[in-house]
Amino acid sequence: MTLKELLVGFGTQVRSIWMIGLHAFAKRETRMYPEEPVYLPPRYRGRIVLTRDPDGEERCVACNLCAVACPVGCISLQKAETKDGRWYPEFFRINFSRCIFCGLCEEACPTTAIQLTPDFELGEYKRQDLVYEKEDLLISGPGKYPEYNFYRMAGMAIDGKDKGEAENEAKPIDVKSLLP
């Protein structure tokens, strides 16, 4: 080993210790999570929930568009129908161990039943616990759209009433009439 190699080695050791000393007093970037709140952007996409309409009924009509739009196939559901003709999911299941939180299911939902919340604490010890059923996903409120009701907006027929007899609905137009 030459004197030059010895001085270069000693210089790198001194430089390393100097850098450690500089970084020891620098401001920390690590957040102490439970004590310090985490900043979430306004459009953060977290846990998926199923919402209710203003009347308290489930918004989901089991159209299956969310399952078709999901790129990883983590949503599964089965349609059922009530006595008054309203559709609802008999079961609704999301596997959060596969979900990539892309938000395509929320965009595809015509009833705004599926909504992504800013909740990000989904840690579990067993993978089976990340499969959420309808009871786990359904919340008591309307979520982001408190006044929206799919059955009122879509003009779905109401049992016992003809078209045009429902609340705030105009009578149907007779297209064969010559009257203005």
UniProtKB/Swiss-Prot annotation:
Enzyme Commission number, as recorded: 7.1.1.-
Binding site for [4Fe-4S] cluster 1: 60, 63, 66, 109
Topological category with respect to the lipid bilayer: Peripheral membrane protein
Predominant localisation class: membrane
BP-aspect Gene Ontology terms: aerobic respiration
Residues binding [4Fe-4S] cluster 2: 70, 99, 102, 105
Reactions the enzyme catalyzes: a quinone + NADH + 5 H(+)(in) = a quinol + NAD(+) + 4 H(+)(out)
Gene: nuoI
Subcellular location: Cell inner membrane
CC annotations in GO: plasma membrane; respiratory chain complex I
Protein name: NADH-quinone oxidoreductase subunit I
UniProt family annotation: Belongs to the complex I 23 kDa subunit family.
Gene3D superfamilies: 3.30.70.3270
Record key words, sorted: 4Fe-4S, Cell inner membrane, Cell membrane, Iron, Iron-sulfur, Membrane, Metal-binding, NAD, Quinone, Repeat, Translocase, Ubiquinone
Function summary: NDH-1 shuttles electrons from NADH, via FMN and iron-sulfur (Fe-S) centers, to quinones in the respiratory chain. The immediate electron acceptor for the enzyme in this species is believed to be ubiquinone. Couples the redox reaction to proton translocation (for every two electrons transferred, four hydrogen ions are translocated across the cytoplasmic membrane), and thus conserves the redox energy in a proton gradient.
